[in-house]
Design a protein with these regions (language model features):
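Flavin-dependent oxidoreductase catalytic cores
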Residues: 1-201
């Protein structure tokens, strides 16, 4: 989902983890999901994965990166909830962990789940973005939840050039994050970010 990233009609605010500003309209605030709506979204994600499996998909990838909806729940900057889905690191990860559990329930433990996530937003200290230390905690939590592989990314819309390679980025500009994740977990790690050399891959 897009959450605060949706290019929305200013009279119809999008939903997000919290009452946070939308990306394109700074004076428009998102509507926070209720707990019942979160539960509905978890069920919908599991059902969508099941439909993918029935259609012949070999695996699914959860889109937990870049400042999109799931990342909004995971990130303190955009998640200021005070219930079980906000506050602590574990609470901010709850939505994601419930989605993974629901996909496994609907598709079986043998159906591979790949998670694409930001090991770091790489935005410096402060501001509520997550850093590499928190990203490694996320990676270990994903592995413990039974995820088959991790697709590591860096950045978010607030610094989109770090997430989407431009002609100004150095080759392999995200490899530092993928390398750190690879050393922290035993499951396969997928890297991206202007990789041209086999030795870098």
């Amino acid at each position: 989902g897009l959450g605060r990233m949706g290019y929305t009609d200013p009279t119809r605010p999008p939903y997000s983890a919290s009452d946070t500003e939308t990306f394109y309209f700074k004076d428009v605030r998102c509507k926070p999901f209720t707990v019942d709506q979160i539960h509905y979204m978890v069920k919908a994600m599991g059902n969508s994965a099941m439909l993918c499996k029935r259609a012949g998909a070999d695996a699914i990838e959860l889109h937990c990166y870049g400042g999109y909806l799931i990342d909004q729940f995971q990130t303190a900057r955009w998640n200021t909830r005070t219930d079980e889905y906000g506050g602590s690191f574990e609470n901010r990860m709850r939505f994601t962990m419930e989605i993974i559990a629901e996909v496994k329930k609907m598709c079986g433990d043998d159906f591979p789940i790949i998670v694409k996530f930001c090991a770091t937003h790489d935005m410096g200290e402060g501001g509520g973005y997550h850093d590499l230390e928190e990203g490694l905690k996320m990676a270990k939590m994903y592995e413990a939840a039974g995820v088959a592989a991790l697709h590591v990314d860096v950045g978010c819309y607030d610094a989109w050039y770090k997430a989407i390679t431009t002609c100004y980025n150095k080759e392999g500009h995200q490899l530092f994050a993928a390398k750190a994740v690879k050393e922290a977990v035993s499951i396969p790690v997928i890297a991206n970010g202007d990789i041209w050399k086999p030795e870098d891959a």
